[in-house]
Amino acid sequence: MAVILDLVVQGLQMLLVLLLAPLLTGLVRKVKARLLLRRGPPLIQPYRDLARLMRKEVVLADNASWLFRVTPYLIFAATWVAASLVPTFRTGLLFSWSADLIAIIALLGSARFFLALAGLDVGTSFGGIGSSREVMIASLAEPAMIMIVFTVALIAGSTQLSTMAEFLVSSEVGLRVSLGLALVALIMVAIAENARIPVDNPATHLELTMVHEAMVLEYSGRHLALIELSASLKLLLYLSLIACLFVPWGLVPAGAAAGMLAIGIAAYMGKLAVGGSLLALFETSIAKMRVFRVPEFLGAALMLGLLATLLLFVSRSL
């Protein structure tokens, strides 16, 4: 019976992240518009856009290979699985043994790898520019992410997200400077990985400074819908990761009554709403930086991750 309940909860989480991802994107757009004194699109507009793209015909370039065709499905599958592994409203899920931060980073890296190859596949100028910039950002963001994982794993004694969340929510952790530095570094990495301002502007489609949008200019129809949905899932994944590691309160422990799941889901949705609103506030108060300044931005994230690890070792040796 317990296995069946765990299976139902795991399926509920997979469905929940899939349904909430477009809503989170709509919330960010709505709050940004309100902050700029505009009405903005409705919250359900991303669902309408996805439905419209799903109905449209797929148009492919003459020289597009099989890689260009399968990449949207690979990106969507990898991102959805990675987002489903992050504990959102309950720990100890059925696949919690595989909810390892290193595995999640590997899944996201695989999706990025195929997207960069797809951008190069058709041989357009924008695709090549976007792919090269994406690889440049990834080469700087992944080392910073590894240092963040290293810091939190040393504190929690594990790289499994359920174990980390259960340990960090306990009273044994207390206030640690290293955790604060890791949080700031993770926020900076999340901004870069999701192509948000100031690293990139997701609202641009025909600018020389774009990164993510440059790689997907040749996609249309259901392929573009899957890529847009994957981008929303990735944003939800990083907000869920921040909530799981640094705001784990509200997570229902494994073995709790089924009625507690509603409290966990409500707490999770509240965290997403706060995180999306803060992201919108941040993006409306800062300008996009030049592409050549991005290495400095991610270099600062890497230094914060290194400093967090160093302070952790120093505090343990005292």
Predicted segments with their positions:
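Alpha-helical transmembrane segments
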Residues: 9-20, 96-109, 172-193, 263-264
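Transmembrane alpha-helical segments that form the membrane-embedded catalytic/substrate-channel core
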Residues: 23-31, 110-119, 184-201, 273-282
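Juxtamembrane inter-helical linkers in multi-pass membrane proteins
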Residues: 37-54, 201-223
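Cytosolic juxtamembrane amphipathic/interface segments immediately preceding
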Residues: 49-68, 125-129, 216-223
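Mid-bilayer segments of alpha-helical transmembrane spans in multi-pass integral membrane proteins
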Residues: 84, 103-118, 139-156
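Juxtamembrane/interfacial segments at transmembrane-helix boundaries in multi-pass membrane proteins
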Residues: 93-97, 151-181
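Interfacial loop-to-transmembrane junctions
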Residues: 278-304
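Juxtamembrane boundary at the C-terminal end of a transmembrane helix
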Residues: 308-318
